[in-house]
Amino acid sequence: MSKDCTIQDVFHHFYSSFESTHDISPTQRKAAYHIMNCKTGAFGVNVSACEDCGCISVHYNSCRDRCCPMCQEFPKEKWVDARREDILDAPYFHVVFTVPEELNPIIYSNQKFLYAALYHAASDTLSELAADSKYLGTDIGYICILHTWGSTMNFHPHIHAIVLGGGLDVKNHWKDNGKDFFLPIKVISKTFRGKYMAELKQLWENDRLEFHGSAAPYKNYYTFKELLNTCYAKEWIPYCKKPFDGAESVIRYLGKYTHRIAISNYRITGMTESTVTFSAKDYKNQGHWKEISISVDF
């Protein structure tokens, strides 16, 4: 087993056979080409020469693809610098919005609409509850970031929200709740569930949804209705992480999340002729790291 391998090595070894047995979209094919050819000379080179000693250095250009693990550091730093003007020296909290896994087939078949619905439900929940005088009674700020994967490379759409811990009331006075988050998690859960499910139902009633693969049964009204009932009955589980330690930590944390891809090079621990092994957090075991070996479907 080779241990010194990268995402690029994995694509070089497995992509051609994967492409021959799977339906690949033009966007996916373009990303794969970029990853396989990044910093190889395929995108040109820069040559620099030292005027003193005459030493010549050749630098291969990167692909700059959003999905490439080798191309995120510079965009991240550029984005972080731009956000410094937006961050206040005030408490911030990290709230994560998730949906029941039963919805995954429909979301996967309707990514444009149902990713947008995630943003709508999360942002409306935060804004409306924060404006309620029972909780804070202010107009707050937040940044929402969509991730579509879990640590084990599974399909797991969820929203990371970085929430300002205070805001301006109707008299334009600043108001916050100190180091404690100002919204009850159970209230967030019920509100978010109601808003997301309402938009999902509206899309179904307006015949805007498509049903491919494992989502096909939900084209039937009664099967779809049963799915809605199942999801309404479940307790949706958003959670709030501890507050950040100052504005700079907020910015750094944001950069990590906005420019993260599904898996990075350091998590690839080995590769054979038929499998790839990578490390992942096991959230069913207190977030301890474990190794997972999978076949070419990686």
Predicted regions and their residues:
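Beta->alpha loop/short-helix hinge microenvironment recognizer with preference
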Residues: 1-298
